[in-house]
Amino acid sequence: MKRFLFISLIFLTAVSATAQTFHGYVYYQKPNGGTEPLPFAQVYHMEREKLIETDANGEFTLKLTARATLIATYVGYTRDTVVVEPGTAEAKFYLTGENDLDESKVVAQQSTMPKLKSIKTEVITAAGLCKMACCALAESFENSASVTVGFSDAVTGARQIKLLGLSGTYTQMLDENRPVMRGIAAPFGMSFVPGQWLESIQIAKGPSSVINGLEAITGQINMEHRKPTDETPLFVQVYGSTDAMFEGNVASAIQFNEKWSMINMVHVGGTASKMDHNQDGFRDEPEDLQLNFTSRWLYYAPSGMQIRFGGRFLYDDRLGGQMGATKDNAFNLENRIWGSSIKNRGVNGYFKIGVPLAEDNHANIALVADFNHHEFDSFFGLKNYDAKQNSAFANLIYQNEINETHKVEFGATWQFDDLTQLYSRDDFSRWENAISGFGEYTLTPGDKFTFVGGLNLQYNSLHGWLFAPRANVRWAPVDWVTLRALGGRGYRTANIFTDNLGIFSTGKNFVIPDQLDLLEDAWTWGGNVTFYLPFGAEDTETYLSFDYFHNDFNKQVVVDPERNMLAIDFYNLDGKSYTNTWQVDFSVNPLERFNITATFRYTDAKVTLKDKGLVERPMTSRYKGVLNMQYATAMNKWTFDFTAQLNGPMRLPKYAAQVWGMETSPVFPMLYAQITRKFKGIDIYVGAENILGYRQHHAIIGAEDPFGINFGVGDTHTMASSSHIPQIFDASNVWGPLMGRKFYIGLRYTLWK
């Protein structure tokens, strides 16, 4: 009852208004003083949280009834902000090129915490993605305390994230608001998105909107890719590091005419050789080769109709395990060589169409469709797991901005999954079909208050009827304080193998009941207060922000490595499972072009385990602190970045704790630094990661005999009291970095129109 009261607290009465048509024009201001229209530039209406796109002539129209703050942006250009007073008929926006080094104007950086969004959203901009190497999406969160990144195990190289103290499987991943990285595509999904393909990343905590489905439990991470309308006919990036990692990216955007444009992006990367820094006989990271290609197209009609479509091809092949392992000798007990081979292949296609139903675009209808085929073939020692998944998604959305105060959105969604998966001759295949209807209402009586409430009703072929209410509210009582609250319900179908990939890198058996309920059901609610402080360099924003979020599961699939030393138990939750997360963020520019951002997050995560009761959730970091400093010289010719992390302890699973002689992992620091030199069209950057060289030593238990049980012989260096504790092979308890100090160098070349 309390949850429903929380969701329905803030429904208010309607307010009507009279609108006037406003005309805007966005131009590129050339270094020689000339101008030219910027087609398909984006204009953000801050008070209404609406994104508008200019037409082929750089023009747009908007219905206005009150004072409006409009921000015009275009990839590779500065932004321009215009405050439009009531009665203003038109305004012009002038953007300059970021690489016009003869300009004296310094490029403004986008705030990483938008002030007027109803949901607190952390934005990692293109400039933020360049603060570190960010070879892939998985490596883009090192400056964020909201998201914790680690390895699922010490063998496969699969990176996993945690948000609000829970696995990334409870975070909905979106590609320009299309659900992605679902099912068997999830374990390595973040490694399959090159960082240089991205324009920005938005991190929103909590269940968010009902429009994109029910799977957002702890939050949503949305990726914005480079656009077909980019003014970059050619972008090239190359990268290499001391741990044998290499990467190359090429992107090319072409505007054929006023209607058609496209962008192609190619990625080649991987790890070229094997290394064993801690001398345990296992590769520190797998040898890997990844090929990635995408093509994205845009058609823009004079009527305002837009069609976007594209496709993607992925190939990834990795080999891990003992140093002597090959694909020919690893899957064989007679050789006594433990190896891991994982091959991912994927094909994706999508289609979007948006049709305006009014001249000023206050009403429109859109269809989003997506198809994904993914294959996952693997073995881990003597365990083999092969899977194939076909997924289809369609979302029909009607949107109507009735006036400045009221907006409604409603529609229908279809989600289909055909999953074939075999583990050691056992068939765990399933077929799932879900159809849902949704509605969402937005109330904005002024620029100080926003309420969004939505409902999603779904019929699922596996789980029956599912009902998800969600709501969020923003209130700014004064200009320098913003308060937000949100709450809602989320559901997902557990994928017991790929959600927990690290379990394959053990010598343990799996105990899976025949009647295991795969439905996971949770409520999440929380709030935020942000203070905008009156100090700092001119034209910058100083803020202090406090968050609290609570997550509570009604249903959950529990993966228990502690009940039985020789097995991993799967069972349905019988008791409580919850997390409490507190976070504080502070950002200031004490000097022009010098930014300091500090963040601290504390998590209290509990779960009920059989025979143990309610305990601290294992392998969940209690806290994380991040300090980032960036300084740029005039015109951004030189940029210096430094990041320091303090990673808090995790409770270790029972048997790992006994072997290592410690109940929790140690607190450890991580330091990163990068220097970038910008020339006209070329950026050269050098950097270092894990500067202190901190590593988790002996991360693999029983590495001497991965096919048997070791009673301490030859492994007593892990702890003094472990000599009589049976040690079964287990590489799944990773709490720290596996690689030592790393240096890298890279180059980015951009050809501008």
Question: Could you describe each region identified by the protein language model?
Answer:
Residues 364-378, 476, 484, 518-572, ...:
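Membrane-embedded beta-barrel scaffold of Gram-negative outer-membrane proteins
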Residues 88-94, 137-140, 159-162, 189-194, ...:
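N-terminal periplasmic accessory domains that precede
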Residues 4, 646-653, 676-753:
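C-terminal beta-signal and adjacent terminal beta-strands/loops
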Residues 138-179:
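Extracytoplasmic beta-strand/coil segments of soluble accessory domains associated
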Residues 544-552, 572-655, 748-750:
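Gram-negative outer-membrane beta-barrel transporters
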Residues 271-292, 298-365, 371-389:
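Flexible loop and strand-edge segments within Gram-negative outer membrane beta-barrel domains
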Residues 31-33, 39-46, 73-77, 88-130, ...:
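Short, acidic, small-residue-rich periplasmic hinge/interaction motif at the N-terminus
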